[in-house]
Swiss-Prot record:
SUPFAM superfamilies: Ribosomal protein S18 (SSF46911). Gene3D superfamilies: Ribosomal protein S18. GO terms for cellular component: ribonucleoprotein complex; ribosome. The keyword Ribosomal protein applies. Part of the 30S ribosomal subunit. Forms a tight heterodimer with protein bS6. It comes from Thermus thermophilus. It comes from the Bacteria. The keyword Ribonucleoprotein applies. One of its GO terms (biological process) is translation. Binds as a heterodimer with protein bS6 to the central domain of the 16S rRNA, where it helps stabilize the platform of the 30S subunit. Keywords: Ribonucleoprotein, Ribosomal protein, RNA-binding, rRNA-binding. This is Small ribosomal subunit protein bS18.
Length: 88
């Protein structure tokens, strides 16, 4: 029972599982497309804020993707950061 010549055991390596990509589409529109301003404006309030999930009906992951897309469009100047305050 000598351990000098014993080969070390190889541990079984597990292949990392792939995360399923979220289908971030709204009908035929892709929510990741920051150039489609007409679709993105549907998810903004009158003052330019991003609407919450309970109003948009998107899942959590889809809402995060949408928020990132809207912010990207704002930085590129395709969407305004704010709208004028509407007083009634």
């Amino acid at each position: 029972m000598s351990t000098k010549n014993a080969k070390p055991k190889k541990e079984a390596q597990r292949r990392p599982s792939r995360k399923a990509k979220v289908k971030a589409t709204l009908g035929e529109f892709d929510l990741r497309d920051y150039r489609n301003v007409e679709v993105l404006k549907r998810f903004l309030s009158e003052t330019g804020k991003i609407l919450p999930r309970r109003r948009t009906g998107l899942s959590g992951k889809e809402q995060r993707i949408l928020a990132k897309t809207i912010k990207r469009a704002r930085i590129l100047g395709l969407l305004p950061f704010t709208e004028k305050l509407v007083r009634k």
